[in-house]
Amino acid sequence: MAHNPRNNTGGTIDGLTTVSTFAGAFAAQAGPFTGDVFPFVMLGNHPAAGGTTTFTTNISEVSLTLLNADGTVLTTVPFAPFETLTLNSPNFQDAMYSSSPSPTQFADAVQRAEFFHTLQPGQPWHTRLSPLVVNRVNITVPRFVNIRLGNGQIIQARSYFIGTAADGSTFVLMLDLLFNFFFSNEVVNEINLGNFQTDALNLAAFPNTFLFSLNVNSPNTPGGCCVLGFHTYFFDPTVVPQPRWLSLFASWISPGLFGAGFQDVLALSHEISETFDNPLLFNPAPDWQFPGQPPNSTVCQNNLESGDPVEVLPNAAFPVTLRVRDKPFTYHPQNEALLQWFEMGATSNAIGGAFSYPNTAVLPHSAVPCPQ
């Protein structure tokens, strides 16, 4: 069954106009939540029904103009050099994976892996993305911005810092508070233009733009860094049924800036896979501890965010080589935790008994319950 998102009349959740989804649930198998049932809603058609669901991915490509303190232009940071590489990445182009008998896209391969036990041999169940560049915009970024603190005090903080990556590209560290303002405005503008839609994935793609938090005690130096992407949704509370626009931010990542293979489209693949598994951000999970933490650590989460458990590991990336402009290019999408990892069971009914995919060795066992 193929769906044309442009003609889709709405999602499958009562009271919402959004993407098509399917529902399920799992029971926690260890820890203080043993036996508790955790419902979920995921992107696409139910695996037991089969068929192929295709969602348009509306892409607004954002370039940056960075200003000096006096308002003159310091430099511009264009997205254009990364457009072709992004559109030809494993997020949108097919490659071979063990979870599919035919070449498919990266997030679809991961989703098929976690529901492999449900599929009949050769069953054509896929959730696919069709990229569409709907706009190319420029955002002007001032050198400083005024921030009102919780106590009412107003301080001036640096908005951005720049550097040069190994490939010669400019990278930008941007204050997250200011970025959130820019991102929200951009999404709302695209919604008002009709470019971002409720039955699609909607992406604001940035060039080497990494977010840092405010350093209150030293506002002219960056705080904690770096956020490379996130996924969320926008909604209109005045309309019934309520429209929800799935909205993603992801940065292109030039090589050499981060470890663990964090480069090119890793952030984009992370956010797309999490949008597949938790599109509306309300999929809970038993409290799980981040891998690699000491046994008594309470560095934990309690949601079905499949990229987060892996992003902290040294082997987060899964290299995939595709041809771009008749030349091989090796991409680095991120390995993902499978649904079975969050179940905290001793075994997994995912493909090959795996807890992660495509590299099944990244997470050799299920999640450890968060210490109480």
Model-identified regions with their sequence ranges:
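Active-site-proximal segment of zinc-dependent metalloprotease catalytic domains
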Residues: 173, 177-271, 275
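Compositional signature of intrinsically disordered, low-complexity segments enriched in polar residues
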Residues: 1-48, 57, 159-190, 194-198, ...
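Intrinsic-disorder/low-complexity loop/linker signature
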Residues: 50, 71-72, 123, 136, ...
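Structural alpha-beta junctions
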Residues: 69, 74, 87, 92, ...
